[in-house]
Regions:
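Alpha-helical transmembrane segments of multi-pass membrane transport proteins
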Residues: 1-446
Length: 446
């Protein structure tokens, strides 16, 4: 066995053993990288250098600001405003409260960018409300946790910033624009699934739609929705960078939460900032250790080996794309979102681009794949949060979620094989030019 082969075995085996032993993911990534470097005879001082280099990125400065913005808005009483707006839009439909839940998650996702925050904030309000109106508790929880994944796609999303930094050379603004249609697609397929179940179970309709009611609720929610406009259109319009827009959005969110909606006092602001620091410390140590892990993968030529392994199975690009989806889905069952993006992107992105998948399109595919993983045992953090909020056994929630897994997989396949769902808005509004000469799937906008 060569040193290269031994190092690869040590790196991957030690990593997955520590994952299954429930080591904190950052420790598993870091320790397996150290063992790999030791096998290769590398100086351990390289670990510190690579960790510092991994977090020394101007783009990554946006991550703490986006996390802070989401926590401030989520703690500032905004959830009720967005639920009321969603109710004015779609509450009149059969299974109206399920539809409201899904649309409210789309709105809230554009502010928090976090599936966990969406589940906790929207779920704590919507699940009891749905149960009171005759909806099954497990169905209500399933709708809540699956719709929370919209927030991962709708900008601003700090996971998209992490992907853009890891992939290299990708515009954060274009990636933000790319998330709107996929997020809407996911919402639509979930609404179709909810409608079918609601008709079968004879769940009630809400109040009739009125223009007056919609305008009233839009007026009360406009302050919250404006935060998204500041971030996305500020970046796309070239007014400021993603980091600058995130910093401005934090100040705006603080002012709106404290002085406009008055959902936060200064003590609440302190608690929100404390939560941000805790979350950020986890994210940054993970990014730092993943930089060492990624360096090990590159030195050992693991991306090339993975590409050769996949192409040895089939040369059909459509099947290779499906295999990539399945690999990320399996990883999502045992790992959280950020480490998958940090570790899998350097391996899978070159394979994806070689078969005609645009880097921005692949970012959207990666994020949705990871989102499905957040709902899947045994790791499934959003699944655990939803079960805890609803006080329902996890196995019953999983059973109720099965039809929605199918809906999400349909959305995933559409995003994989129809590039323009992800790329249409960046091309039309952001002037994005795809580097892929022969895209996988039909292209309608050039």
């Amino acid at each position: 066995m060569t040193v290269q082969t031994l190092a690869i075995v040590v790196l991957l085996v030690s990593f997955f053993v520590m994952i299954f032993l429930r080591f904190p993911i950052a420790y598993a990534v870091g320790l397996s990288s150290v063992l790999c470097l030791m096998v290769q005879g590398q100086a351990l001082s390289d670990v510190c250098r690579l960790m510092v280099k991994g977090i020394s990125s101007f783009s990554l400065m946006a991550v703490p600001f986006f996390i802070t913005m989401g926590v401030l808005m989520g703690s500032g009483g905004i959830s009720e405003k967005l639920i009321a707006l969603a109710d004015a839009c779609v509450g009149w439909m059969r299974g109206g409260m399920a539809m409201v839940n899904i649309v409210a998650s789309y709105f809230f996702g554009g502010i928090s960018g976090s599936a966990s925050a969406d589940t906790a904030s929207i779920g704590s309000i919507m699940i009891p409300m749905m149960v009171d109106q005759g909806y099954d508790a497990d169905f209500s929880t399933a709708v809540t946790i699956t719709s929370s994944c919209e927030g991962l796609l709708v900008p601003p999303s700090h996971n998209m910033v992490i992907y853009a930094t890891t992939a290299g050379g990708i515009s954060v603004g274009s990636l933000f624009l790319a998330g709107y249609l996929p997020g809407a697609l996911l919402a639509i397929v979930l609404m179709i699934g909810s409608y079918i179940i609601s008709v079968k179970e004879n769940y009630p309709k809400g109040s009739p739609f009125t223009i007056k009611g919609f305008i009233k609720q839009l007026g009360t929610s406009i302050w919250a929705l404006a935060a998204v406009v500041i971030v996305v259109f500020g970046v796309v319009g070239g007014v400021f960078t993603a980091t600058e827009s995130a910093a401005i959005a934090v100040i705006y969110s603080l002012l709106v939460s404290v002085f406009v909606y008055k959902g936060l006092d200064w003590k609440g602001v302190w608690h929100a900032l404390d939560e941000c620091v805790n979350t950020l410390s986890i994210v940054l140590i993970l990014i730092a250790t993943s930089a060492v892990f990624g360096n090990c993968l590159t030195m050992l030529h693991v991306p090339d080996l993975a590409a050769n392994a996949i192409t040895s199975v089939t040369s059909n690009p459509y099947i290779i794309a499906l295999l990539i989806d399945l690999i990320i889905l399996v990883l999502g069952c045992i790992m959280d979102m950020a480490p998958i993006i940090l570790i899998a992107t350097p391996i899978l992105l070159p394979i994806a681009t070689s078969i005609g998948i645009d880097p921005i399109q692949f970012g959207i595919i990666m994020v949705l794949n990871c989102g499905i993983g957040l709902l899947t045992p045994p790791v499934g953090s959003v699944l655990f949060i939803g079960s805890a909020v609803a006080k329902r056994p996890m196995e019953k929630v999983v059973k109720a979620t099965l039809p929605f897994y199918l809906c999400m997989f349909i959305a995933l396949l559409l995003l994989t094989y129809v590039p323009d769902i992800s790329l249409a808005i960046p091309k039309l509004l952001g002037g994005y030019v795809s580097p892929i000469a022969n895209p996988l799937g039909p292209v309608f906008i050039h």
